């Protein structure tokens, strides 16, 4: 199998697998006071220290979650619940991940004021529109660091500075960015930052929410775990694997980023030569090293995706969380693409274990299969 869908889930690193196996043998509950519980608590504390160190944060600022979707819910609902009277509004960019955007729509249906800020053709937010949108009623601004479909990097420090001037908090979804580019909550100016393990070689179902000291979040569910900020017994194997993977990803970031960027460049340039009219979504904007969102002219993206899959090549039509939807990508639509253009787009994403052979296989297969899916399926009927 040629795997080119690392933005959905990247394979677990050996260090993470080893950490998960070891943690599975720790049977105690971290909340218990006996010896087995203390052993579990020690593993939890050490894992928290490792994640905090990788983020340049303090352990007390890290809350473990089941992933970015839960983390976003804790952050958004918690921020609204703890906001001062009169601050009930949520502002977010038009290209946020569904875990943020869909929750905002649910809140809007319940009466919470929600404002969506447009982006330009590159996928970058309109800062003038954002400046107009954020006001004295705004409790929370949501701006992702790197878009999951296009890889475009958003100007989070500028957004954070604007939010701070208006007295609003900033939630930054750093899920795609962590382990690939520096994620320093202090430098970003964020108040809340999301990461999740499966994007940098950790296990699925384990994530972390960084909370700036002094930021109050109302509890979303009853339970004393994670200093009262996230209820439920902690997933120790997942947390241990998350910590191990993030530590390794950060330590090897420069080396892996350079290699991945070179592979992406080879993929993009090779396909541009072989496919006349190919377009790169997000061109002209800073991007992650491993994501290429490519628009194939006059193509049925789903048909091309299926053809690739039948040859053992795994790619994506966009966010894994919205695969199977008949609606065009909200990200590409926000960037000004027509429904047909959005449906002609495939996302190829590379990761820590991608190799040159993966790219060369795609360069051979994509143009050939594109010609096949464009060809008529039957001969014309006689007149």
Language-model regions, residue ranges each:
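Pyridoxal 5′-phosphate
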Residues: 1-383
């Amino acid at each position: 199998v040629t795997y080119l869908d690392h933005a959905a889930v990247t394979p677990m690193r050996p260090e993470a697998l080893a950490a998960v196996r070891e943690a599975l043998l720790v049977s105690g509950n971290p909340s218990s006071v006996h010896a087995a519980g203390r052993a579990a608590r020690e593993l939890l504390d050490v894992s928290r220290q490792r994640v905090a160190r990788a983020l340049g944060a303090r352990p007390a600022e890290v809350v473990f979650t089941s992933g970015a979707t839960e983390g976003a819910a804790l952050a958004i609902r918690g921020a609204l619940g703890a906001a001062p009277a009169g601050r009930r509004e949520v502002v977010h960019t038009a290209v946020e991940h569904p875990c943020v955007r869909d929750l905002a729509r649910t809140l809007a249906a319940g009466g919470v004021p929600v404002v969506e800020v447009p982006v330009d053709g590159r996928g970058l937010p309109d800062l003038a529109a954002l400046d107009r949108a954020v006001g004295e009623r705004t409790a929370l601004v949501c701006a992702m660091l790197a878009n999951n479909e296009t890889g475009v990097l958003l100007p989070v420090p500028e957004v954070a500075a604007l939010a701070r001037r208006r007295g609003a908090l900033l939630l930054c979804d750093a899920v795609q960015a962590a382990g690939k580019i520096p994620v320093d909550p202090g430098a970003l100016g964020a108040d809340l930052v999301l990461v999740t393990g499966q994007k940098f070689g950790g296990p699925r179902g384990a994530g972390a929410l960084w909370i700036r000291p002094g930021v109050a979040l109302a509890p979303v569910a009853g339970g004393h775990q994670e200093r009262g900020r996230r209820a439920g017994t902690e997933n120790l194997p997942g947390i241990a694997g998350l910590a191990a993977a993030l530590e390794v990803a950060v330590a090897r970031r420069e080396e892996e980023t350079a290699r991945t960027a070179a592979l992406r460049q080879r993929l993009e340039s090779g396909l541009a030569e072989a496919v006349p009219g190919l377009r790169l979504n997000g061109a002209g904007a800073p991007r992650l090293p491993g994501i290429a969102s490519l628009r194939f002219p006059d193509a049925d993206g789903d048909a091309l995706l299926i053809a690739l899959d039948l040859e053992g090549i795994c790619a994506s039509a966009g966010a894994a969380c919205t695969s199977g939807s008949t609606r065009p990508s909200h990200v590409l639509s926000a960037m000004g693409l027509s429904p047909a253009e959005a449906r002609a787009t495939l996302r190829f994403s590379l990761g820590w274990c991608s190799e040159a052979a993966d790219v060369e296989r795609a360069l051979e297969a994509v143009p050939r299969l594109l010609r096949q899916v464009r060809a008529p399926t039957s001969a014309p009927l006689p007149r």
